[in-house]
Amino acid sequence: MASLKKRAKEFETPYPVTKAITKGDAVTKLSMFVMGLGNLAHKQIVKGILFLAVEIAYLLFMIEGGINNLYHLITLGGRAQEEVWNEAKGIYEYTGGDMTILFLLYGVATIFITVLFFMIWRVNMKSAYEVECRAKEGKHINTIKEDLEALVDKRLHWTLLTLPILGIVIFTILPLVFMICMAFTSYSKVGDHLTIFHWVGLKNFSTVLGMGNSIGKTFWSVLGWTLIWAVLATFLNYILGMILAIVINRKTTRIKGFWRFCFMLSATIPQFVSLLLMRTMLKDNGLINNLLVQAGLISSPLPFLTNATWARATVVIINLWVGIPFTMMQVTGILQNIPGELYEAARVDGAGPVTIFFKITLPYMLFVTTPYLITTFTGNINNFNVIYLLTAGAPVPVGATAGKTDLLVTWLYKLTVDLQYFNVGAVVGILTFVILAVVSLITYRNTGSYKNEEGFQ
């Protein structure tokens, strides 16, 4: 708690909004309602006009459509498209109905615009209180030229970060909030709610997390396989890649560059190409089964992609072929940076190769690569390419929404793109994020990389 208070003090400003409201003069307090008034009163004309222009623009936006957007965000509309007979033309015509998805989008966007306005309003209050205090103390009040010069000097970070942050808000945070809102609606092909839908509260979460329906049972089944897949894909790649790197890195190994080149060949081929090619080769009538049959090793094709157990084993093995070269190269770089003095001291003390590995090499590797392991684990939970391109989630039981090799991310794709269960898909997306965030944060905070940031000991 003390550390949090200390960090909070670092962000304190000498001109907070609370003091501007409680201790400011009449002009500063009026700036709450007429933005820029405090700046105008102290001859910061351009700055005051800009604040006032922002307020006028926001008020016009709210009058023209913002208030209506917020109202429709609550109601989500309800007027469906109607079929009306046109006597003159002798045909049926359709009257325009409500597009609920647009009401939801515009409502969320209006909230974001309102939050942005409130942030600018806070800057306005701080600025008004600052110029008031500086005027009372007889200090210099900046001109617009000095403020602009500060944007490329003392406040350069504002200039550089404004556009990236704005881009993140518009293209990342806004769609995420929109998706989260969708999870609380009936937006789905079920019941013909693709055009007109309404708020349903936590019903979708109950559907996904409950065991009394097909969606709920599928979720827990897919979640279990996703976690098993992530653990196997992460640690098998890591362990085998490390062993391969250690073997190649030994002093007795010759032509090391050649062996590294051979193992990196699979990484140079685009995954899209190699996985689709492997999928074709592993089919019942594919190259591998044909070769095995012709060699007399099997009498019937092996169900690489049609049997649940075989398919799961296949994707894990193929993922090793794809992922081990990357791990090998990462580990190779780290191995070459382990201080040689540690090994020399261990040998002097009589330690053998196994002891050196478990006492020096492995602890050092884990210390350096734990963040990489966590990132790889989360990446494997969201590993869309390997699963979808290799098996497309197959085999799929009759009537099921997910196959035996589907991960949460591939199931989410099917729910939204193929089945148009957008509300359920949004819930799955939220739950996936929560699982990843909790596992990653708890794991990282309990690692040596976090607790001993000063270095390996």
Could you tell me what each predicted segment is?
Residues 2-15, 21, 25-26, 33-41, ...:
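N-terminal signal-anchor/first transmembrane alpha helix
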Residues 6-9, 86, 293:
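Polar/charged alpha-helical tracts
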Residues 25, 82-86, 98, 142, ...:
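Acidic-enriched, low-complexity/disordered segments with a strong bias for Aspartate over Glutamate
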Residues 35, 80, 138, 296-299, ...:
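Glycine-centered secondary-structure boundary/capping sites
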Residues 43, 54, 65-81, 112:
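Transmembrane-helix bundle segments that line or gate the permeation/cavity pathway
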Residues 65-73, 125, 156-457:
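A structural signal for multi-pass alpha-helical bundles of membrane permease subunits
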Residues 72, 76, 90-93, 140, ...:
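Helix-loop-helix
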Residues 81-112, 210-224, 303-308, 418:
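Membrane-interface segments at the starts/ends of alpha-helical transmembrane spans
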